[in-house]
Structure formats: structure tokens, C-alpha cells
Regions:
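Membrane-embedded alpha-helical segments and adjacent helix-loop junctions characteristic
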Residues: 29-128, 257-346
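Short glycine/serine/threonine-biased micro-segments
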Residues: 12, 59, 68, 108, ...
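Generic signal for short, ordered secondary-structure residues
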Residues: 101, 105, 140, 231-234, ...
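C-terminal transmembrane helix pair
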Residues: 114-115, 122-161, 167-197, 323-409
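Hydrophobic alpha-helical segments, principally membrane-spanning helices and signal/leader peptides
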Residues: 36-39, 46, 95-97, 132-140, ...
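Signature of multi-pass transmembrane helix bundles
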Residues: 1-54, 163-294, 311-313, 385-409
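Generic hydrophobic alpha-helical membrane-segment signal
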Residues: 2, 91, 98-100, 135-140, ...
Length: 409
């Protein structure tokens, strides 16, 4: 329901602003730009879905091999104590826990191409447990919030952009991103847990969160001992070694059980195209709405309004120049990336705004895109509290990013 209101608001607000521009300022370009954005956004949505087809086909095939070989079930048993607490509505030992783990792991390593197909597989498995096929279940929402909060341990792509833009130390945003994304994820889990009345103060969850904190601290310490080139090399190498190990491990596990690995892969891969096609209408809907909102100038007005309010309250407005990235990130990953690059081009890669825009880019994820793709793949229309929890996690990430960047830079 929330997504429905937001979608309507994108169009209505954009239309009203365009009317005002035409009436009061004689701007005859607003409506053509909005209409052009509908065509370009529709094309982009289809191209994204088309681009996902090959990757979906590959990873759905790999997942089927893992299922046949028992590797996914083994992961499920290993993670049962944690997932029983975090996803109480999922039966203990269900294969979906393995898919969830692999999706979260791929996201943490910055492997988006692997994470999305694994996430869609997890959604399909959770849908089999859903009695109301058009309504999101509690596990679906918790899983989606884990994705939208954008927990990332190795932000390789952002460091590459900083290097290309001439940053003296492209890796100097690594620790701030790690801390900001940790706060956004923790907030997402807590808020969703409150909505779903999940007891997070139990021994298993406290030990798990403590272990994650220790892992984050160890990674921060390890990478802080490296120079920028070593850091980029090691992070990329580790991420891809782990990913390739998963693929080979699944294949060997299936071969050990005398499974016809090739046939199992083909069986799973057949679902790739149909899944990509199911996503198209949902993706077109959200990207077109975002495109119209941005083309109308509403986004620029929102940012200028925030800057005026902060200045009126006597606050420091240094961070406002990076807000376009923060505001765009829940709406469009490519749009936020463009805002980040624009901020580094305008203010400099090593400026406060340039660095903060990079931390914004890494601290949250594309909430509405994820909702459109993940829920769209299984035909979910009623999202319940998914949007609220996802946006609160995003807000926590933005606030944490601002505070941390003031501390670091």
C-alpha cells in the first residue's frame, strides 16, 4: 500500500511542478523532458531485465546443482540456529536458508551480479511457503530489508570510481562505508524485528551480532595495514575466489552424490528467462515513475529546500551538496552512481562532498529497485511494511554516513 501511494505521488508531484514551471516561468521544456524520461526509463527497465537473463540463467542453474548435491541443505543446517530466530516462519532446515545466506554473502562481497539471482531464488522458495500469493510474508520482508540496507564489506566498485576520478587515496572511504552500512543493516534488522515482534535479545542473536562486529573489526584492521593497490587487489581476489569456490564446491558435492550435474544445471537454468520476463512490468513501473519525478525538477527542489532549512536552523550545510546521491540511491542505482560521479567532478574526489557522496553510495542500496525486482519476480503486490522498514534502514545509513564523515574527514 505504501508503494502505491509513493508511486502515485511521483507522478502527481511531477505534474504539478511542471504546470507551475509552465505557468509562472514559461518553461516549455518541462513536459517534453518528462515524456522523454518515460520512454528512456521504459527502455532502461527492459534492458536491465534483458541483461539479467544470462546471469539469472547461470545462477539458477548453479543453485539447482547445489540443491541436488545437498550443499544448500548443508548450509541450511549450519545456519538454522540463527535463521530460526531471524526468520521464525521458515521451517527449520528449509533449503531457502542456504539461498538467503549465499545472497547476503554475495552482497557483502560486492558481487551484485551473483547476489540478485540468488536473491530471486530465495524469493521463489519463500513463495512456496506463502498462503497469500500476492502478499509479502514476514520472512520476505526481513530478507528484503537485509538487501536494501546494503551491508557491504568490500566496496570495490566505489574505490575504482574514486581512483578514476583522481583521488589521492581511493580507499580512504573504505572504513566509513563499512561503519555506515553496518548501522543501516543493524537498524533494518531491529525495526523489522519490532514490526514482526521478533525477540532479538536472545543468546543466539547476541552472539551472532557480536561475531559480526568482531569480523568487521578484523576486516578494518587487516585492510588498514595495506596500501591502496594491495587493498583493491586483495579485496577483488578474495571476493572472486570465494565465489568460484562456491561454484566448484556445488559441482563436486553433486558429483559425489552421483548426480547428473549437467542435467541438473539445465533444469535449473530453464527458469532464468521466465523469471527475467516476470520482472519487466514491475521494473518499468518504478523506473518510469522515478524518471518523471527527476525530470520535473522535483528532486532539485527537494535538495534546495533541505539546504535552506539546515541553514535556517544554523546547521552546517557542507553535507547538503552530497544529498542528491543519498536521495537518489533508494530510487535508482545508476542515478545515484551518476550523482556520486558528478559530486566528485564538481567538488573534487578528495573534497568532503566527494567523499561523503561515495559513502552514501556504499551505505545503502536501491530500495525501490529491489522491491520491484524481488517482489515482482513472484507476483507480490501487497508489500506491507517492507517499504517503511527499508527506508528507515536507508535513513539510518544516511545519518550514520554524515556523522562518520564529519568524524573522519
Amino acid at each position: 500500500m505504501v508503494l502505491n501511494y509513493i508511486w502515485i505521488a511521483f507522478f502527481v508531484v511531477a505534474f504539478v511542478i511542471a504546470i507551475c514551471k509552465l505557468e509562472f516561468w514559461g518553461d516549455v521544456e518541462a513536459f517534453p523532458e518528462m515524456m522523454n524520461s518515460t520512454f528512456s526509463s521504459s527502455k532502461t527497465a527492459f534492458e536491465i531485465s534483458l541483461g539479467l537473463t544470462g546471469v539469472l540463467t547461470l545462477w539458477l542453474g548453479i543453485m539447482r546443482v547445489g540443491e541436488k548435491g545437498g550443499a544448500v541443505n548443508a548450509l541450511s543446517r549450519l545456519l538454522s540456529p540463527v535463521f530460526v530466530k531471524l526468520f521464525p516462519d521458515i521451517p527449520k532446515g528449509h533449503p531457502v536458508t542456504g539461498s538467503i545466506f549465499m545472497n547476503v554473502a554475495a552482497n557483502m562481497l560486492g558481487l551484485d551480479n551473483a547476489a540478485t539471482p540468488l536473491g530471486l531464488k530465495a524469493m521463489e522458495q519463500m513463495q512456496t511457503l506463502n498462503n497469500k500469493k500476492d502478499t509479502a510474508t514476514n520472512p520476505m520482508i526481513m530478507f528484503l530489508v537485509l538487501n536494501t540496507s546494503g551491508l557491504t564489506l568490500i566496496p570495490v566498485s566505489i574505490m575504482v570510481y574514486r581512483a578514476q576520478m583522481g583521488a589521492a587515496q581511493p580507499t580512504d572511504i573504505f572504513v566509513p562505508i563499512l561503519l555506515a552500512t553496518f548501522f543501516s543493516t543493524l537498524t533494518g534488522i531491529i525495526v523489522t524485528g519490532i514490526y514482526q515482534r521478533i525477540n532479538l535479545l536472545n543468546r543466539v542473536m547476541l552472539l551472532t551480532l557480536g561475531g559480526i562486529c568482531a569480523l568487521v573489526a578484523a576486516i578494518i584492521w587487516g585492510f588498514s595495514q595495506m596500501d591502496k593497490e594491495s587493498m583493491n587487489t586483495v579485496s577483488t581476489l578474495v571476493a572472486n575466489i570465494l565465489l568460484m569456490t562456491i561454484i566448484v564446491g556445488f559441482i563436486l558435492a553433486a558429483a559425489r552424490k552421483r548426480v547428473n550435474v549437467y542435467d541438473a544445471f539445465i533444469e535449473g537454468a530453464k527458469d532464468g528467462f521466465s523469471t527475467a520476463v516476470r520482472i519487466i512490468p514491475y521494473l518499468v513501473a518504478i523506473l518510469v515513475a522515478i524518471g518523471v519525478f527527476r525530470a520535473s525538477g522535483a528532486m532539485d527542489m527537494l535538495i534546495d529546500g533541505v539546504k535552506y532549512m539546515v541553514a535556517a536552523l544554523g546547521g552546517d550545510t557542507d553535507f547538503v551538496g552530497a544529498l542528491p546521491t543519498a536521495l537518489m540511491k533508494p530510487l535508482s542505482g545508476s542515478g545515484a552512481r551518476g550523482m556520486m560521479v558528478d559530486a566528485m567532478t564538481t567538488y573534487g574526489a578528495d573534497s568532503f562532498i566527494g567523499r561523503l557522496s561515495c559513502v552514501f553510495q556504499g551505505s545503502t542500496d536501491t530500495t525501490f529497485y529491489i522491491i520491484a525486482v524481488y517482489f515482482g519476480s513472484v507476483g507480490i503486490r501487497h508489500t506491507r511494511h517492507a517499504v517503511t522498514c527499508g527506508l528507515l534502514a536507508d535513513l539510518a545509513g544516511v545519518i550514520a554516513a554524515i556523522a562518520i564523515c564529519y568524524l573522519f574527514f
